[in-house]
């Protein structure tokens, strides 16, 4: 803890790098996974193919992908793009499954009601299914973001890892306080981001909060 308190400026600089490497892939993954999930949800064959591909992608070891990517996309070994591209692939693989699960959680009667009042397929997806899937979607997003924050530290092995660089430096110089500082900083970062996402999810779904408040009253009336 002493090491962290005496190196706050370095911790802040590494945190900014860590956030950049963690959150840019989340934005890219969401931009791909949400439309893809909406597209394949009602197509059984495409859905199976998509989920199978996502499962295969996530089984690839992250360190191996970080090392191989420069040969595939023509970047330098120490280019942040390697970590961003790799984590974008992992994020998409995780999020597409989360999107499908979130859409599946929307009650069928609400879809039927939307059709009954004249919503077309696109309008139903955007105005009914997607908003109602937010609670499950945010739960999946929280898992993905925390996973990314942890996986960025693996990049420190190849010289790009944000707070993870304290791990490798600590091991190389046998400074346990530096390793502990990296662990504490990364844990704190994950907790803060997860809390913010949880709060954002609640603000985006006020009807869920209202339902939780009413439930005990209804139960007591019985």
Show where each model-derived region lies.
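Short, membrane-interfacial amphipathic segments enriched in basic
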Residues: 1-9, 39-40, 123-127
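Transmembrane alpha-helical segments of polytopic membrane transport and secretion proteins
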Residues: 1-2, 9, 13, 195-222
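Transmembrane alpha-helices
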Residues: 23, 122-155, 181, 197
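Loop-to-helix entry region at the N-terminal start of transmembrane alpha-helices
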Residues: 10-21, 66-94, 134, 178, ...
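Hydrophobic alpha-helical transmembrane segments of polytopic membrane proteins
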Residues: 163-199
């Amino acid at each position: 803890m002493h090491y962290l308190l005496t190196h706050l400026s370095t911790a802040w600089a590494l945190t900014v790098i860590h956030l950049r490497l963690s959150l840019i892939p989340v934005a890219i993954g969401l931009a791909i996974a949400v439309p893809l999930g909406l597209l394949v949800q009602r197509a059984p064959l495409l859905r199976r193919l998509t989920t199978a591909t996502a499962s295969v992608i996530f089984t690839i070891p992250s360190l191996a992908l970080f090392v191989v990517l420069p040969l595939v996309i023509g970047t330098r070994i120490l280019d942040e793009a390697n970590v961003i591209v790799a984590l974008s692939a992992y994020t998409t693989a995780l999020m597409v499954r989360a999107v499908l699960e979130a859409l599946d959680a929307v009650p069928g009667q609400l879809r039927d009601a939307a059709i009954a009042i004249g919503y077309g397929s696109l309008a139903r997806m955007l105005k009914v299914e997607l908003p109602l899937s937010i609670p499950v979607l945010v739960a999946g997003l929280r898992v993905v973001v925390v996973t990314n924050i942890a996986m960025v530290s693996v990049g420190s092995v190849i010289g790009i890892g944000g707070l993870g660089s304290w791990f490798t430096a600590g091991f190389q110089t046998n400074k346990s306080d530096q390793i502990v500082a990296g662990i504490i900083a990364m844990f704190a970062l994950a907790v803060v981001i997860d809390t913010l996402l949880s709060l954002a999810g609640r603000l985006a779904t006020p009807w869920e909060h209202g339902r939780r408040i009413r439930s005990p009253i209804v139960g007591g009336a019985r």
